[in-house]
Amino acid sequence: MGSKEFYGGIEKSPNRSFLKAMGLTDKDISNGLVGVGVAWSESGPCNIHALSLGNKAAEGVSHSGMTPRLFATPLVIDGMAMGNEGMRYSLPSREVIANTVELTIKGHGFDAFVGISGCDKTTPGMLMGAARINVPSIVMYGGSTLPGYYMGKKIAVGDVYEAVGSYQAGRMTVEELKIMENSAVPTAGACGGLYTANTMAFMSEGLGMALTGSASPPAVDSGKTKFAFETGAAIKTLVENDIKPRDVMTYEAFENAITLLMASGGSTNVVLHLLAIAHEAHVNIKLDDFDRIGNKVPEIVNMKPGGPYTMAELNEIGGVPVVMKKLLDKGFLHGDVLTVTGKTLRENLNEIKILNIKQDIVYDIERPKMRTGGIKILRGNIAREGSVFKASASSVMKHTGPAKVFDGEEAAFRALMDNKIERGDVIVIRYEGPKGGPGMREMLAVTAAVVGKGFDRDVALITDGRFSGATRGIMIGHVAPEAFVGGEIALLKDGDVITIDGENGLLKASVSDEEFNRRRESWRPPEPKYSTGYLSQYAKLVGSASRGAVLE
């Protein structure tokens, strides 16, 4: 039901009175109403500029001949919540954002949706909401921060997390750490590396839901403001041609997005998010699809944390379209899929020119960074439903060692700080899954400390929780089934030998089925951590990470 049904006719005079109280005219109302959703907050720098971009998008909507209505969505700044109780709210915020889009658009009879996103969960939340309401929709990522500098070297906030471990290991002074802290995030915008926010920005173009080239301009770049206006203006074409999100986000579009994820070596969180968006779009993709595509697509993007570059530098050579053009030209993408431009992906990329310059930000397909995709799906007797490994950010593909088991992130972090972790160990952090956490926290404080102590080649970590996109090293997340529901990770003990084999997709413990069954007899699920509030509700409804951790 759109604005004509909500506000048309004599009987809807009272409804129109509310619109006219805000200065709208009959013509404004008859032009059609577009909800412009902005993930804006003063909670952190990732989204502090988003309101100005939302206003510019609203100008574009007006310029197209439709009437914009701005609204805000809530958000959680992952980097600020990291290592704290607040991180439990990060993944659940994705569902709240999707719900906010649905409530606002459907609750007010808006005809279309324009989304301006930013930090990690805002882009997937908006795409989930768009797929669910299935009215003409378009999104634009608000952009990342510019690189910071430390002693003449470009840095991002992930370097500060690792510096904490370096300080604890005596490899950095507190004064040096403070200098890095003060300079890592110099402007508004999301984290600059190919972490979750920027990987989801890649996905917005890969799915066809954002204008070509709109993802990469930094938050403070004038190009981002231009794209905000053009994004708003583009909604009229979508409405006139009745192009809806499920017309764009097809199975082939998701294959394109997974291909782009593998070629970029982006954040493992995006596996969760693509599964969740597909769920809302009624598209059946599974972890097997990531495995299948990842085994044939080379990794060609050389950005942090697996490389030295940031989104700002990718933008200098043409942005995400350069990556997609290289993939399309070699037959890795479906070129005939529809996009929010009203054109096919191939038509959009036909206009893209790859600069003939010497650079190592995006490799050629023939000479890739890795022969296969940057994310591996691992399975075995402690991950029967699967787990994820960011191979692009690890120089080690195989590791075998004794388990040191911790119930929760804090216990593992204390063990690291107390020098109780030795080279060769496999840290196991459990009861951090979607239900058990609840909220499936990211383990960046621990993983960064592992790297900061110089253990990134010698210590592995497995968890039913998540990892920040800034994570690097031998880190395996999303282990499913999770501990809280009785997954085998709940049955591991100190000293169990864990084998990680990224090349062959294997994650297993040297524990027989019979021994696991014996241990299960004495296992009991822990009491839920929350009995009231949103996290209590979330824990009751959320499903497995292997299905995107959606509410079921």
Curated annotation (Swiss-Prot):
Q: Which cofactor does it need?
A: [2Fe-2S] cluster; Mg(2+)
User: What is the superkingdom listed in this entry's lineage?
Assistant: Archaea
Give one GO term, molecular function aspect: 2 iron, 2 sulfur cluster binding
Reaction equations catalysed:
(2R)-2,3-dihydroxy-3-methylbutanoate = 3-methyl-2-oxobutanoate + H2O; (2R,3R)-2,3-dihydroxy-3-methylpentanoate = (S)-3-methyl-2-oxopentanoate + H2O
GO BP field:
isoleucine biosynthetic process; L-valine biosynthetic process
EC main class here is lyase
Enzyme Commission (EC) number: 4.2.1.9
Q: Which PROSITE patterns match?
A: ILVD_EDD_1, ILVD_EDD_2
Binding of Mg(2+) occurs at D78, D120, K121, E442
Where N6-carboxylysine occurs, residue numbers?
K121
Keyword Disulfide bond in the entry? The reply is no
Q: Name one Pfam family in it.
A: ILVD_EDD_N
The record's listing under InterPro entries reads:
DHAD_IlvD/Edd, Dihydro-acid_dehy_C, DihydroxyA_deHydtase, DiOHA_6PGluconate_deHydtase_CS, ILV_EDD_C, ILV_EDD_N, IlvD/EDD_N
Cofactor mode of binding and number, as noted = Binds 1 [2Fe-2S] cluster per subunit. This cluster acts as a Lewis acid cofactor.
State which pathway it belongs to.
Amino-acid biosynthesis; L-isoleucine biosynthesis; L-isoleucine from 2-oxobutanoate: step 3/4; Amino-acid biosynthesis; L-valine biosynthesis; L-valine from pyruvate: step 3/4
Please give the Gene3D superfamilies that the UniProt record associates with this protein. IlvD/EDD C-terminal domain-like
Entry keyword set: 2Fe-2S, Amino-acid biosynthesis, Branched-chain amino acid biosynthesis, Iron, Iron-sulfur, Lyase, Magnesium, Metal-binding
Ligand binding ([2Fe-2S] cluster): C46, C119, C191
Where does the record place the catalytic residues?
A: S468
Q: How does it assemble?
A: Homodimer.
Q: Which HAMAP family match?
A: IlvD (MF_00012)
Role: Functions in the biosynthesis of branched-chain amino acids. Catalyzes the dehydration of (2R,3R)-2,3-dihydroxy-3-methylpentanoate (2,3-dihydroxy-3-methylvalerate) into 2-oxo-3-methylpentanoate (2-oxo-3-methylvalerate) and of (2R)-2,3-dihydroxy-3-methylbutanoate (2,3-dihydroxyisovalerate) into 2-oxo-3-methylbutanoate (2-oxoisovalerate), the penultimate precursor to L-isoleucine and L-valine, respectively.
Question: What family does the database annotate?
Answer: Belongs to the IlvD/Edd family.
Protein name (record): Dihydroxy-acid dehydratase
